[in-house]
Amino acid sequence: IQKKEDFDIQTRFGTFRMRAYLQTTNKQVHIALTKGTWNAGESVLTRINTTQVNNDILGTLTDNNDKKLDDIFRKINEVEKGAIIFINQEVKSLELLDRIAELKVLQSQGEMRAPQIKMDTKDFGIGAQILHDLDITKIELLSNSTAPTKRVGMIGYGLEITDYVNY
């Protein structure tokens, strides 16, 4: 990855530092928003979002994505430091068709939510590179899951989850 932009940005959640990274293998752009500072080796509140930055129409139609983002930013603002990484996934037509088919099943079950965008295993490597650039190796993982998921591959990237924080 290559860091292409690095500047402070005013958001509805306050001032954050925005970094944009270009993935050289496929020209995808990933975004990191950070607040505050930390020392090397310090555990940092972190959320890693897999998203389709340019085209998540299903999420827009069915989810309250703003509510989820509000909760994530609120948590980071509470502790006055943290990172939110947006891993941008390439939109492929067949994957979109698969998500539409899954949406149909969810709707038939009365669920008003979009199917999750599944994180590609390659995304862990990209996320790890971004985290290392941010000098984050110990993570307090922001998650909306009630049961912590084992992230087996993270140790191989020199990352450690020290805690799971619900938002």
Predicted segments with their positions:
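Catalytic domains of riboflavin
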Residues: 1-167
